[in-house]
Amino acid sequence: MSSHRAEEIEASDTCTVARPADGKSAGRADASVPISPPRLGMRLWSAGLGRLLEIAPFLTTLVLLSVYPMLRYLLRDPFPAEVFRFGFISFWIGFLIVNMVRAQKTRQAILHAMEVDWLGRLRGLQAPLSHYAIFIPLKNETNRHVLYRTFRSVERLQYPKSLVTLIPIIEAEDRVTLEKLDEVVRQVAGRMQVEVFSYPTDRVPVKCKATSISTCGRWLTARIANGDFAGGPGGIRVLIIDADTLLHPQDLAFREYTHREEEAQAAARGVRGVVLQSLTTYTANYWKVPMLPRLHNTGFVLYQMGKMQSRGDYLVLGPGTSMDVGLFEAVDYFEPNRHNEDMQFRYKVVMEGYRVAPLKIPTWGQAPLSTQDSWGQIARWARGAVDAKFIVAYRQRFRDRRLPIANSKPVQALRALLANAMPPLTVLLPAQLILISWISPCVRDVWPTPVFLSPDVLALKHAGRSLCVSTMAVFNLVFQTIVLTSSTLLGMVVVPYTLKPIIYQRPPRRWRRGRTFLEWFRLVFTPINLHNYFLMATAQLYTQGKLALGLPITHTPVTRK
């Protein structure tokens, strides 16, 4: 078992980043470590900008959610409001259909990738294979079975055992996790290469997964430089997964093949390098909780699969990130912070001139969650989904390169703000349109029978005039009803077909028949999951609101039990 003394890290509670004070960091100002400026004006400007950037995500969401009510009730002419309504409904259904079409293409590619012998193909090409160092940061892991299944998935990889080293990363003070880890390591001893990396945290102010990964990355880099870590013929790559991640047997071989293809294309396009991110989905091992609603099993996975067909960078949350060890060192590892370090790493990579490319093969998370735990899990995902403050404050390392406009900091910051606002927007704005339309007098014009709480009673009027003054308002009500109903029916047919073979592994034999029926039933009747989408939207608003009010959002509930 290796042990490594953590380097001194400087940070404050208001920072998003804590960085080691080593020689390599010299000459580069930290992304948000406060450096006392000589003048009071500069200090006030820095503090004010920081608070504005913390408020910006919440403000962006509120502004976008208030556009339609303001257009409808503040203007004398309701026509602009109806144009906005028609445009958003068209965008909403168009986005859904495009994602479904793209997801179908991704589905075919994923199913194909899971069946091909990629190692045999690499050997047929006589391609030199890379040595993969698989980082698994551990924190408060009390379920030995979850750890064992993760280790077993690594053991089953169809890749030379000598070129796979599993490196669990653990804080020296985390005795409970260390005890569980020792039990699992003893079980797999002799069957795979495992090097446990333990480091003390007495001088580490920001104790998080990013700190663990960065500390281990520097330790591994030093070992490589000293010749203590043998590389493969194709070099050394780092793969980062979570403690509950299951890898497909073809993962490393397909990853190596994809790395070579993407890097060849990157060189032709003038990109510095490539980071791969695999599709994040979930297994059927949460069969213990029948009919369990999981947000990621429908909308989020569908969105991920759609994004895999885009030409842009694949900035999606999840384990399964891999890159060359030299690239990992060049971008100075992860950024320890109180938000989501995965997303900060990906944004940093893009701004430094690298590409984040999708790996069209799934990694499965195996943790069962109760409905109560879902709030903590979704709030944890929402917490840093995007950190515009990090993007604005970050200072690039490679300033001598001319990057595309799409990779620039202003564009990435705007992208971050919009991405942060999209979950509440796509859930709450359709609900807002429905509610407002049902208190409109237009309902009387298109509904054949009187409805509960007559529109004449609930209708809001402006200067004595009805708000339903155009045929477009009537058309929008019909159009909205048809679109939202058809999207539900479309989801009942397409989503189960698209996701079921990718999300689920086989449940235990004694549960197989009943579980198959329950899973299909839950996926087909997608309205059952509507409350989960509202849970996602409110969790995002809750997190943004705490950040805007200056309240701490550091705490991450441990949901993997």
Could you describe each region identified by the protein language model?
Residues 347-363:
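Catalytic donor-sugar/metal-binding loop of nucleotide-sugar-dependent glycosyltransferases
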Residues 359-373:
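Active-site donor/metal-binding and catalytic loop motifs
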Residues 169-184, 199-205:
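A conserved acidic beta->alpha catalytic loop
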Residues 233-248:
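Short beta-strand-to-loop acidic/aromatic patch adjacent to the donor-nucleotide binding site
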Residues 189, 206-232, 249-339, 371, ...:
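Long helical/loop segments within the catalytic core of UDP-sugar-dependent glycosyltransferases
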Residues 2-52, 62, 89-131, 394, ...:
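Juxtamembrane C-terminal module of membrane proteins
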Residues 150-163:
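Short, acidic, metal-binding catalytic loop of nucleotide-sugar glycosyltransferases
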